[in-house]
Swiss-Prot record:
Its EC number is 2.7.1.100. GO terms for molecular function: ATP binding; S-methyl-5-thioribose kinase activity. The lineage of its organism: Bacteria, Pseudomonadati, Pseudomonadota, Gammaproteobacteria, Enterobacterales. ATP binds at N40, K57, E111, D112, L113, D246, A247, E248. This is Methylthioribose kinase. The gene is mtnK.
Amino acid sequence: MSHYRTFTAADAVEYARQYGQLADPQALVSADEIGDGNLNLVFKIRDRDGVSRVIVKQALPYVRCVGESWPLTLDRARIEAETLLIHGGFCPRHTVKVLHHDAELAVMVQEDLSDHHIWRSELVKGHYYPLAAGQLAEYLAQTLFHTSDFYQTAQEKKAEVSRFSNPELCQITEDLFFTDPYIDHERNQFDPALLPQVLELRNDAALRLAVAGLKHRFLSKAEALLHGDIHSGSVFVAEGKLKAIDAEFGFYGPIGFDVGTALGNLLLNYCGLPGLFGPRDAAAGREQRLQDVRELWLIFADRFLALCHQQTREAALAVPGYAEQFLQQVWTDAVGYCGSELIRRTIGLAHVADLDSISDAEMRAECQRNALGLGRALIVNAPQIEHIDALLARIRQNG
């Protein structure tokens, strides 16, 4: 893009003055680069009192954690901004507000969420937000229903599928979720103590067959405009509040992928808790995670079905019973994608603090083995895990 340049802190301040929608833009005087992700520069823009007022986020033309040897499209910044704008239109309460974006500079200005915390960090600390799972379920139901065939016309949706074609970011997901963990790949990272389990997964014919189906559905089922990366590190929480951020992986894909990714991150925390806390606190935290899993699915399903019954525009899809039949397939997909998230976060490229921050090496490896075992069980048995209580029973059975 001819006008692209990488922002300095001073550039970010000036940009925020122009597009931050503040009554006194000259009050913005400094910027802190806070990006700890893999893909972007993120600046907190502060006023004269040191208070953060807005966020400026710019995509880099490469994967930050790898370097310029892994180039990456800047169009992801447009896709992220437009995904958040669409999601925010249907669920403003739980979507970060985009104040401005520029496709050529691959930059956007967002509301500041300094009064919120990253959900994963809070879960790892043992901080419980009892409303968060239900709020995330509401976000998923609203955004996924309103961008699906139930609500959009066929012509609208076909145009949107093209507009949100995101092949480079999707390939990252395709590789990291469904290919790398099951082969000997240089991107994989895992404790040598896990090598026996890793080799078992690579040689597990039933697992590989089920993963092939998950990948094929990811490639071919353009059901709704997904967030595409809705893990607990892409969600901000505060008391009674929740906001989804970081939607650069947005594309039209299988609804169960977003739901399964969200469930999988709750279960990654479930698997890690015995290594993060003593027995009593870990047991209590695990019960909270299971309650979160239950609420996330049940509230999502209830809200999605209610929207189907009230707002479906496509007459053929409004036939009694079809929405329920469709949702059952979403559930089966979600269970499988949940399992793939557990495995790829344990032995693939991108790990999570829920497991990696466990200080005792032996306990960490044991928690990681549990995550791998649960992930395999969910992927292979997804068609037989027909409802939420069966899922919870399978989780408890895994230990």
